[in-house]
């Protein structure tokens, strides 16, 4: 159970500051085992976040601060780690969805071992992070970093991989031959339950398991020493419309700048993540990610995007059980484009590389309650130097039972 008070300042020159808001997100996860080794995970969720009015209108923090630069799906660099990506509407049909503290099913996943060191999983509502190790020590939505940008490697988010709304159906495997090697892979579809592909706007993501947007992803995790974790990611995804589905930037929609939203795209994504436990009191962590987006309907337009982060994590900071984090990096942004796709779309006044710095402190009151004050500052937000430096602060309270 998460409660947060947050505020934002900055944004586009003529934009309004977002109001100070109070948000909640409540989850109930039920785990059932039939053999003692398997697990059926059922997750219920309610929240009061809003992603704004999809396609037209406003309502999200990103749309308030960046009315021209934010995604038409309410995505932007100011998003929180614990904020559902498509809050309050269903991107499968652009209709209202779960929100306003309605209780909805956000996770349904079955995991079972089938042989020594080999496990399979399948579910109609799942996320990539259900299967892949996050490696970043402050990835926790309730007790880790506040921003969405620095929580996990962005490759894990491609094609709605971690929407926190139960969007994707997925199946895959986990292979752990020894204590050093962990290999996992999955196939996921964000439109598996839809029988007919009507195209945009009726079914913008497609329909069926194999006719529309999908992602095929793999992660190789290595533990070469007791104090070092390494992760290597690759994902291939097809998107029926011109989006990434990461929820990390306004460029996640209309990714091929200058081309229509209805343009389908193929995305090849690569990433690497590490955590080095220097000593019991300080960890170094970081990631790098690169996305190669290509037009999929006969054209040759392309756009490349990149992101990186370096951070320090402090277990038992000032007292046992408390943690702290300090991060700096580049939020996901365009770094190249051509053959008809523009590097600087019309909505960007003066292209510049964005940077973000963030700090948080998680204070553990008892085994069930913690509070996390923190803030992050974005320079050249949404990749536009005409935008004012944007600050986001939050006080998050987390109850765990």
Residue ranges and their predicted role:
Residues 14-18, 30, 94-98, 159-161, ...:
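Outer-membrane beta-barrel proteins
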Residues 54-92, 143-148, 193-209, 240-263, ...:
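Solvent-exposed loop segments that connect transmembrane elements
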């Amino acid at each position: 159970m998460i409660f947060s008070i947050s505020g934002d300042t900055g944004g586009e020159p003529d934009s309004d500051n977002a109001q100070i808001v109070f948000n909640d997100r409540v989850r109930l996860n039920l785990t059932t085992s039939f053999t003692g080794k398997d697990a059926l995970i059922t997750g219920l969720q309610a929240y009061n976040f809003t992603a704004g009015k999809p396609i037209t209108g406003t309502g999200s923090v990103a749309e308030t601060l960046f009315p021209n630069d934010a995604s038409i799906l309410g995505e932007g660099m100011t998003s929180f780690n614990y904020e559902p990506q498509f809050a309050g509407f269903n991107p499968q049909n652009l209709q209202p969805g779960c929100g306003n503290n309605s209780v909805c099913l956000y996770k349904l996943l079955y995991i079972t071992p089938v042989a020594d060191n080999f496990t399979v999983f399948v579910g109609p509502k799942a996320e990539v992070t259900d299967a892949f190790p996050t490696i970043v020590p402050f990835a926790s939505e309730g007790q880790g970093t506040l921003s969405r940008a620095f929580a996990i490697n962005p490759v894990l988010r491609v094609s709605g991989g971690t929407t926190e709304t139960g969007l994707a159906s997925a199946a895959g495997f986990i292979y752990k031959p020894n204590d050093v090697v962990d290999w996992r892979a999955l196939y996921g579809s964000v439109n598996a339950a839809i029988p007919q592909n009507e195209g945009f706007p009726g079914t913008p993501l497609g329909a069926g398991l194999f006719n529309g947007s999908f992602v095929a992803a793999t992660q190789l995790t290595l533990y070469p020493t007791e104090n070092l974790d390494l992760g290597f990611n690759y994902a291939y995804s097809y998107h029926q419309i011109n989006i990434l589905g990461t929820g990390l930037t306004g460029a996640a929609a209309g990714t091929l700048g200058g081309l229509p939203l209805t343009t389908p795209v193929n995305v090849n994504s690569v990433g690497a993540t590490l955590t080095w436990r220097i000593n019991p009191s300080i960890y170094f962590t970081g990631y790098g990610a690169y996305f190669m987006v290509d037009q999929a309907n006969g054209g040759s337009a392309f756009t490349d995007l990149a992101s990186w982060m370096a951070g320090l994590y402090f277990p038992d900071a000032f007292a046992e059980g408390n943690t702290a984090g300090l991060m700096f990096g580049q939020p996901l942004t365009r770094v190249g484009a051509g053959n008809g796709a523009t590097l600087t779309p019309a909505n960007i006044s003066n292209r510049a590389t964005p940077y973000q710095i963030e700090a948080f402190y998680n204070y553990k009151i008892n085994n069930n309650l913690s509070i996390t004050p923190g803030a992050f500052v974005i320079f050249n937000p949404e990749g536009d130097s005409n935008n004012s430096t944007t600050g986001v602060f939050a006080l998050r309270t987390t109850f765990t039972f």
